[in-house]
Amino acid sequence: MASRKEALARRANRVRRHLKSVANGRPRLSVHRSSKNIYAQVIDDVAGKTLASASTLEKDLRGSLKTGADTAAATVVGKLLAERASKAGVTEVVFDRGAFIYHGRIKALAEAAREGGLTF
């Protein structure tokens, strides 16, 4: 029987394998969630470069947020990431949720990024 860590890695690989087949050259919006913070970045896999990133660890966000571990914080990060991605010239992405289910903070970040102008 696989350990929890192995199962999460297997699920993340399965999601990313599917994304590669549907990406068609679009950058990937990768999301990572920890118990205290949330991180997101837009990655160009062809060039191997990060085009835009945002997280609850940034100094300007840390002062304004009550905590980095709620849906309100994820919403702020999603809007900030969409703003930075549009400045970098990115409007279309594929959403890489990794091993996380599309619910709660992950869903809040995705919806805020859509409101900010990203399409996926």
Curated annotation (Swiss-Prot):
Matching Pfam families: Ribosomal_L18p
MF (Gene Ontology): 5S rRNA binding; structural constituent of ribosome
UniProt-listed SUPFAM superfamilies: Translational machinery components
Taxonomy, superkingdom: Bacteria
InterPro entries xref list: Ribosomal_uL18_bac-type, Ribosomal_uL18_bac/euk
GO BP annotation list: translation
Signal sequence, start to end: none
Database matches in Gene3D superfamilies: 3.30.420.100
Function: This is one of the proteins that bind and probably mediate the attachment of the 5S RNA into the large ribosomal subunit, where it forms part of the central protuberance.
Protein's name according to its UniProt entry: Large ribosomal subunit protein uL18
Species of the source: Rhizobium johnstonii (strain DSM 114642 / LMG 32736 / 3841)
